[in-house]
């Protein structure tokens, strides 16, 4: 099957739009399944909208734009990956005179700091690499803020300490900033360790769906709701303007220690009307370009690629997913307060998607737990079959749009079972414990070193744009 053949495109379209007919048939043959039917119609409509919109997505090509860039890399216990992360950045196809790198060791307990010093000497980059070491672990958000305050570039590029960028990723990532209303850009993510088992490969193709399909759709509306930490970029002045708000976010009266990337995206996507930054030279407050929530744009660049190390063991994967589910809850609540100001297509797709995410858990419980316990096991099989069909369509579209190999289709279908399991377990637990947080993916045996901080909150950090962070009085 040729992905570029018009017949292939028509076949995928027929399979996508044709998914409405089984739903209508189910409604006729099972009039009692109103909830399932209503949910299925909305979900199918959203999926069709997503495929139609993402099909027309095109990344911005390289037009020669080369602003001054500051790359910020917060690191916590990444001795195995940090050298390669930095080496990839310094091998980037970007003018040396316009690229600085700031790495912040956030209280690592392994040899991360030694590796940072080693790579600076090995690469011979001198003062192009600034190394900062926190005496103790303060969290990713605080580490990133330190880098933001030290940065001199017009554009901030944020990269996770276990992510590896393509040689042309940075130059392609900054191209959308030629539009002055673009405040943030999300790069494309993929798994770096697909050779380490089935679980990493499942995640790799799930990333392709979430990035190329869903972020591609959001980018058509210029409203990408989460710039992934593995590769993203922001205008520095925009981040400085919201830095205090970001550092001092709370949830249920506690400092927010998760969802750093999603919340930063929210703050710049909300617009910068009435925001100021303080001049480092004379201390004057300078107004930032006043963008309303309707005008501020966050987009996706599928051609700017970074590869990240994904979990290889199920317990590690589940801890990561729990952190992500909790951050999604926080981010959804905060984004819901302003997304209605966006153009109608962006607002409608956002609220519909959030409704479907939470509705999916309720529907999963009813059709996979309640109805089988009532003796109706067929309903559970029908529900799983529907999810597998949707995943099959996602795999087809990833194969066609991302030029992925054909194995993308079965792996995407296979991830359905993990997704359903997450809806029935991790997502529900995240709902019940949304106040908990921390980089629990990196914590041994599921413990959380932030628990003491959560139980006894320290004074919130107030950003001093011309110096170090100081506790609020």
Annotate each language-model stretch with its function.
Residues 1-12:
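N-terminal membrane topogenic signal
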Residues 316-326, 331, 411-451:
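Membrane-proximal soluble regions of multi-pass membrane proteins
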Residues 228, 236, 440-473:
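Short linear elements at protein peripheries
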Residues 332-353:
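Flexible internal linker/loop segments at domain or repeat junctions
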Residues 71-82, 419-431, 449-467:
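Cytosolic juxtamembrane regulatory segments of multi-pass membrane proteins
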Residues 63-339, 462, 470-472:
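Non-transmembrane catalytic domains and loops of membrane-associated enzymes and transporters
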Residues 22-56, 61-64, 350-437:
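Membrane-embedded multi-pass helical conduit in multi-pass membrane proteins
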Residues 10-20:
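Alpha-helical transmembrane segments
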